[in-house]
């Protein structure tokens, strides 16, 4: 039996743009995609902290270092520019593998620059995770 387990997330990202007439998806800065262990075309769940909306879509490559978080197509109706969102991926795992799995969390600032990256379970709260400056 396989379980659907939380794999990774980009936490507290800010929506930078919305394009209702573009094919449905979410465009994400590839630096953030890589840091979170996500991939282009991967299915994601998006949670809007401002209005409570939750929806699924897939990742499109955004320009590296741009901080782009753009909702496209129908998803553009579920968030406004400036809204805070969480972008989550899941993976299928056998129960034994899932027991030891530690999801990746990428915390970003208001401009979608990474502040902290950590494996959930290494720290009890995001506040205890070292910042990127502390890791180097």
From Swiss-Prot:
What's noted on cofactor binding? Binds 1 pyruvoyl group covalently per subunit.
> Could you tell me what reaction this enzyme catalyses?
L-aspartate + H(+) = beta-alanine + CO2
Where are the disulfide bridges? none
Needs which cofactor? Answer: pyruvate
Q: How is it modified after translation?
A: Is synthesized initially as an inactive proenzyme, which is activated by self-cleavage at a specific serine bond to produce a beta-subunit with a hydroxyl group at its C-terminus and an alpha-subunit with a pyruvoyl group at its N-terminus.
Give the enzyme's EC designation. 4.1.1.11
Q: In which residues is substrate bound?
A: 57, 73-75
Q: SUPFAM superfamilies, from UniProt?
A: ADC-like
* Zinc found in the keyword field: no
Q: Where is the active site?
A: 25 (schiff-base intermediate with substrate), 58 (proton donor)
GO molecular function of the protein, one example?
aspartate 1-decarboxylase activity
Q: Which residues carry this modification: Pyruvic acid (Ser)?
A: 25
Give the principal location in a single coarse category.
Answer: cytoplasm
The domain of life for this entry's organism is Bacteria
Which stretches of sequence are listed as region Disordered? 117-136
- Localization per record: Cytoplasm
Show the GO cellular component annotation of the record: cytosol
Which terms under GO biological process does the entry name? alanine biosynthetic process; pantothenate biosynthetic process
Annotated metabolic or biological route of this protein: Cofactor biosynthesis; (R)-pantothenate biosynthesis; beta-alanine from L-aspartate: step 1/1
Q: Which UniProt keywords apply?
A: Autocatalytic cleavage, Cytoplasm, Decarboxylase, Lyase, Pantothenate biosynthesis, Pyruvate, Schiff base, Zymogen
Question: Which Pfam families does the UniProt entry name for this protein?
Answer: Asp_decarbox
The family this protein is said to belong to = Belongs to the PanD family.
**What does the annotation say about its assembly with partners?**
Heterooctamer of four alpha and four beta subunits.
- The protein's name is Aspartate 1-decarboxylase
Q: Which organism was this protein described from?
A: Chloroherpeton thalassium (strain ATCC 35110 / GB-78)
């Amino acid at each position: 039996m396989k379980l659907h387990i939380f794999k990774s997330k980009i936490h507290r990202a800010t929506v930078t743009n919305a394009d209702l007439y573009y094919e449905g998806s979410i465009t994400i800065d590839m630096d953030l995609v890589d840091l979170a262990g996500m991939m282009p075309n991967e299915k994601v769940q998006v949670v809007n902290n401002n209005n409570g909306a939750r929806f699924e879509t897939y990742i499109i490559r955004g320009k590296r270092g741009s901080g782009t978080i753009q909702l496209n197509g129908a998803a553009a109706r579920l968030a406004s520019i400036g809204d805070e969102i969480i972008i989550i991926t899941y993976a299928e795992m056998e129960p034994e593998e899932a027991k030891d799995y530690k999801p990746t969390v990428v915390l970003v600032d208001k401009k979608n620059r990474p502040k902290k990256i950590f494996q959930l379970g290494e720290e009890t709260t995001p506040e205890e995770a070292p910042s990127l400056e502390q890791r180097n």
